[in-house]
Amino acid sequence: FLVWRECMKRKTIDIITLGCSKNLVDSEQLMRQLEEAGYNVTHDAEKPEGEIAVINTCGFIGDAKEESINMILEFAQEKEEGNLEKLFVMGCLSERYLKELAIEIPQVDKFYGKFNWKELLQDLGKAYHDELYIERTLTTPEHYAYLKISEGCDRKCSYCAIPIITGRHVSRPMEEILEEVKYLVSKGVKEFQVIAQELTYYGVDLYKKQMLPELIAVSYTHLTLPT
């Protein structure tokens, strides 16, 4: 009975992810933090299912910006109608246009940049757990997961705003990636889709050479994947 009462008291947070698979990985990491903080968490609900919604936006190209703004406005309307207590927005769009969005859409309780997860947890009155940095609540089918190996990009393509939003290319240390792979394998993952803004550039900043082949080789050398 006491367990049931505690579950009834737990608030639900809806995470809405727009854009690419790299954004999805960010959402999965945030979901794990929120679950650890004691929330029930849903993903990509079409209508608010909980008291709080967090929209993880995309600002890659014009169509992505439009989709993100429309989603924010849709959930802002839900809040005005009393279907939401709190509405938060994070991700690439708010990283680039935070001040402008805050002025234009005041229904949003707070806008965060792409990497401000700790601040979001703090504003909810919860602690951010650094020890969970490789853990995620997977939204993909149980047999596979995305594996993000870097952030940012050093290229300056005229159509793309990613370097402006996320900054220069930053590779994750190989040891950290392998630790995440081991964790995901322990959860039953058998297939990894390696992702980054510029995959072939992995390692140039850390190891002074392209290291994607070595990363894949080391993964297979040191890991026993389930059959």
Q: Where are the regions that the model predicts?
A:
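Short, Lys/Arg-enriched N-terminal segments with co-localized hydrophobic residues
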Residues: 1-7
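Conserved small/polar residues in nucleotide/adenosyl-binding loops
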Residues: 221-227
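Proteins enriched for Cys/Gly/acidic motifs involved in redox and nucleic-acid/cofactor modification
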Residues: 8-202, 211, 217
